[in-house]
Every structure is written in C-alpha cells, then in structure tokens.
Amino acid sequence: MLRLGSHVSMKAPDMLLGSANEAASYGANTFMIYTGAPQNTRRKPIDELKIDEAQPIIEAHDLRQIVVHAPYIINLGNTKKPGYFEFATDFLYQEIQRADAVGATQLTLHPGAHIGAGANVAITQIIKGLNAVIRPEQHVQIALETMAGKGTEVGRTFEELAQMIDGVTYNEKLSVTFDTCHTSDAGYAIKDDFDGVLNEFDHVIGLDRLKVIHLNDSKNPQGAHKDRHTNIGMGTIGFDTLNKVAHHPQLPDISKILETPYVGEDKKHQLPPYKYEIAMLRAGQFNPHLIEDIEQQR
C-alpha cells in the first residue's frame, strides 16, 4: 500500500485530534508530528494530548502509522558541553515515552553533530546515548535519519549509521529514516541512480531497517551538504525520481512523509502544499501548475 503523508502540527487545544484531522484533510494515510516545539523542552503532559479523542479519526482514515520527530535540541554526539549528555538522554527517554503513548511506530532522530570533536568521537557518544535510553519493552523504534553533512553532522554516510546501529545492544529498536534531500545533498546519486543507492543501503545497513522516507526535493545540487528542502518537482531531484521513490516496489507500506515548504511570498500567510503534493504523487503525474493551485486556497 502507498502510504503518503506529511508533517502536521500538534498544538492546543486539539493536540493529536487536530493532527489527525489535518492529516485526513490532506488525503494522507500516515503523518508525522513533533510532540512539542522542536527547539525547546516545553511539553504538555501525556494525559492532555487528546490521544483517545483522536482514535476515531485515526481509524476512519487508516492513520495508524504515526511518526514522531524528536526535537532538534537533542544532540547525542555532543561531548563538549559538561552535563549535556544527561540532559539529552533524559529528554530523549521522555520523548520515547510520549511516542509510545501516541501510538507512534517510528521516532525519527537526527543522530547528532560532533561540534569539532570528530565523527568517531561523536559516533561513540551517540552509541552510548542510545544504549542509555533504549529499553527492550518500548514499542517505538528510533529511526536514525540520513543527514546532509551540513556543518559537523554525523550520519552523512550509510557506513556511519551502520556503525551506530552495530554498537547498540537492543538494536532491534533501531531503524532508519531515509531523507531524499539529505541523502542527495550528502553526495548520493538519488536523481540518477536511486536503485543503485538503495542497493548500497541494503548492502551496508539492510533494507529491513528502512522504515520511514522523508520525501523532499532539494534546492541544491548533489553533494552540496546544504539541507534546503523544496516542493516536489521544483528542485534538483525532480518529480520523476521522487515519484519513483514513492511507488518503489521494494518500499511498500513504508511511511513516505513530505517536509516540503509552505507556499507564498508573505510568510504570515503561507499555505500548506501537502494536499496537492500527495494527490500529485498518488496520480503519478507531475502538475506543472502546483504552486498556482496551492495559492488558489486563499
């Protein structure tokens, strides 16, 4: 089954109920949320997330494949800041509890950045952090994300991700989020040889680990290490490749999540593209008037 969705908001007063309704309005059958603002630690108690109230919408629209994105402020690779490791692991452990509570199947996590200490030092610290938080009884898998290699990010190669996975005791609780923009920006030939890239992923990590795809076009050329998403078919990867990824026979039932930018010159009145991008991908036909159609929502 083709599972397409997007990032949706989760905010008061409707919380998860609002997230499910937003996803349904886009014609999605999967979705991704942050359990709070990704740049801070403020979180509502689990009993205020309206989890039970959301269930009828989730059932009616087959939205049970929920992805939670861990907050950006968690950097398990940081070995420089005293006391930070305890903060990062405590907060990630709380996010695992929240992801389990909302019924998420995957918790996407940026592995981290070495901030000058070197990739191997950071990877060792990331393994230590994952071993500190993962419990065999948790339901959600932590889906380490492929990174663009911006700055001192680690996880820019399949080998780095495999090294992390191999070092974790309960690594059956680990999976991978494959971001098409990040992976292209990291230097992989997504546009020209996606099958070859997928075969390389299978050889290095194993396709059985691939549980989430972030389906994004890129503003920059292959190998740019920039991480700038753009709308489907409007970037350097292009519609044909992203449509191939969405419908790829080796990737059935995997959540394909759009993180493409809102549309509009006025930042206060930008519009979500997801209903239109999902429809375009389901049809398998590029819409050259995509941006105009989105702007007609006004």
UniProtKB/Swiss-Prot annotation:
Binds 3 Zn(2+) ions. Zn(2+) 2 binds at residues 145, 179, 214, 259. GO terms for molecular function: deoxyribonuclease IV (phage-T4-induced) activity; DNA binding; DNA-(apurinic or apyrimidinic site) endonuclease activity; phosphoric diester hydrolase activity; zinc ion binding. It holds the Pfam family AP_endonuc_2. Zn(2+) 1 binds at residues 69, 110, 145. The keyword Translocase does not apply. It is an enzyme of class 3 (hydrolase). GO terms for biological process: base-excision repair. Its EC number is 3.1.21.2. InterPro entries: AP_endonuc_2 (IPR001719), AP_endonuc_F2_Zn_BS (IPR018246), Xyl_isomerase-like_sf (IPR036237), Xyl_isomerase-like_TIM-brl (IPR013022). Zn(2+) 3 binds at residues 182, 227, 229. HAMAP family: Nfo. PANTHER family: APURINIC-APYRIMIDINIC ENDONUCLEASE, ENDONUCLEASE IV ENDODEOXYRIBONUCLEASE IV. Belongs to the AP endonuclease 2 family. Endonuclease IV plays a role in DNA repair. It cleaves phosphodiester bonds at apurinic or apyrimidinic (AP) sites, generating a 3'-hydroxyl group and a 5'-terminal sugar phosphate. This is Probable endonuclease 4. It comes from Lactiplantibacillus plantarum (strain ATCC BAA-793 / NCIMB 8826 / WCFS1). The lineage of its organism: Bacteria, Bacillati, Bacillota, Bacilli, Lactobacillales.
